[in-house]
């Protein structure tokens, strides 16, 4: 891949994704196999005005080794230096950039039960720091091809060709063309126009139907609004948290989901694929879940904590999105969630609530924004998916027909 194209992608991540501000600190999190591209992103951050760029290196094989060899108690412990680092982030609010390149199968063989217990044990310590930073800093998740990931996506190609093809797919779906920044400005404007229309309807609930058996109604929070593309921090900084993105999303009202929904794509979770699954909801809670493969893992996901059995997101993505048109299953939620409509179990987004900077976290939970240690997207979009809005004034308005926008 030409370095000029990769530098354009790095600039896109720094200037449009994270929207690094002059004088701001930046923290980049990446795997050890990506030093060249991480250097490009760091350089782009400095050019955007970053005061300091720090890289936190990860190595999936070491993470797997630690999970297998260390005790649950050791893994659950949040050391003093970790707390100090989290407090430093609260105090300085650095911009955060996450570069994904991990092997989708890299944690295969690790006990899901052990991982869940570790996550549960650490969550109580980390959550107060996370809550203090909520909505106050920019962040961006983007992707870089790792060899194992590329071979998973393109198993019949050589390693080099698989990486090249995955680069091509990432750059295409991220609109890295002759002028990617202009392309993203136009894309954000289109997504915002769709969100504005949806928000003008006064939606009380969304009703989903598809020939695969999906028959689900999800209630909306009156104070919530659809968001898409870029978003603002409480301080007014505009950024794009996901590259790519094709969704208009909203956090539904906890406790208001009735019916059943069927997946349309596999869910890659903890190094394993959950395939051909369904989830049935009563009074907002997932009360029944079945899957052709890894049903027990799906049920453990739903039982992770009190909030993991409730929905935290409804996202509208046309079935003919650029990502779905590639025909590629990326085995990575960042991409696969933008291939078609999806829902998410777990944590909702407080920034979907109108005037959220002037509300307390407790007020937004009381409105119905779900809280959980997890946020797991799963795809439900099909070529015949129909979504109908039931509005607070009594109107019934088509939102999706035949898998795509009805307006």
Predicted regions and their residues:
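Active-site bordering "gate/hinge" segments
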Residues: 1-258, 389, 395-398, 405-407
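Short solvent-exposed loop/turn micro-motifs enriched in small/polar/acidic residues
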Residues: 11, 199-201, 270-272, 307, ...
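Generic recognition of flexible, low-complexity loop/linker segments
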Residues: 14-16, 194-195, 204-206, 248-251, ...
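Long, well-ordered mid-to-C-terminal structural blocks that present hydrophobic/aromatic surfaces
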Residues: 250-306
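Active-site lining segments that contact anionic ligands and/or coordinate catalytic metals
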Residues: 256-258, 274-276, 283, 309-313, ...
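Dual-mode signal for accessory low-complexity, basic/Gly-rich regions
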Residues: 286-357
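Extended hydrophobic packing segments that form well-structured cores
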Residues: 362-407
């Amino acid at each position: 891949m030409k370095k000029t194209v990769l530098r354009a992608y790095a600039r896109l991540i720094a200037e449009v994704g994270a929207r690094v501000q002059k004088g701001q600190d930046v923290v980049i999190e990446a795997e050890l196999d990506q030093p060249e591209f991480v250097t490009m992103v760091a350089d782009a951050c400095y050019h955007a005005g970053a005061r300091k760029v720090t890289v936190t290196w990860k190595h999936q094989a070491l993470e797997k080794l630690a999970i297998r060899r260390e005790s649950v108690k050791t893994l659950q412990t949040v050391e003093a230096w970790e707390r100090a680092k989290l407090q430093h982030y609260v105090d300085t609010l650095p911009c955060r950039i996450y570069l994904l390149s991990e092997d989708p199968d890299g944690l295969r063989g690790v006990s899901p039960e052990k991982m869940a217990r570790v996550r549960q044990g650490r969550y109580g310590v980390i959550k107060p720091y996370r809550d203090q930073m909520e909505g106050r800093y920019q962040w961006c998740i983007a992707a870089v091809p790792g060899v194992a990931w590329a071979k998973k996506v393109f198993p019949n190609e050589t390693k080099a060709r698989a990486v090249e093809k995955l680069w091509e797919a990432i750059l295409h779906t991220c609109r890295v063309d002759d002028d990617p920044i202009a392309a993203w400005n136009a894309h954000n404007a289109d997504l915002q126009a769709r969100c504005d229309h949806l928000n003008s309807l006064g939606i009380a609930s969304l009703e989903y139907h598809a020939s695969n058996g999906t028959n689900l109604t999800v209630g909306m929070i009156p104070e919530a609004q659809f968001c898409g593309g870029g978003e603002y921090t409480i301080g007014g900084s505009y950024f794009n948290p996901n590259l790519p993105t094709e969704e208009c999303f909203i956090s539904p009202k906890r406790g208001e989901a009735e019916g059943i929904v069927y997946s349309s794509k596999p869910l890659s979770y903890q190094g394993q694929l959950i395939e051909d699954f369904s989830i049935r909801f009563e009074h907002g809670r997932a009360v029944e879940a079945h899957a052709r493969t890894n049903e027990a893992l799906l049920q453990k996901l739903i039982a992770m904590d009190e909030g993991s059995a409730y929905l935290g997101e409804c996202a509208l993505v046309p079935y003919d999105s650029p990502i779905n048109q590639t025909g590629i299953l990326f085995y990575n939620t960042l991409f696969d969630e933008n291939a078609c409509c999806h829902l998410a179990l777990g944590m909702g987004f407080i920034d979907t609530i109108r005037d959220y900077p002037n509300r307390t976290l407790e007020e937004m939970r009381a409105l119905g924004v779900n809280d959980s240690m997890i946020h797991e997207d799963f795809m439900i979009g099909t070529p015949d998916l129909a979504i109908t809005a039931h509005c607070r004034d009594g109107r019934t308005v088509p939102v999706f027909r035949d898998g795509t926008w009805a307006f």
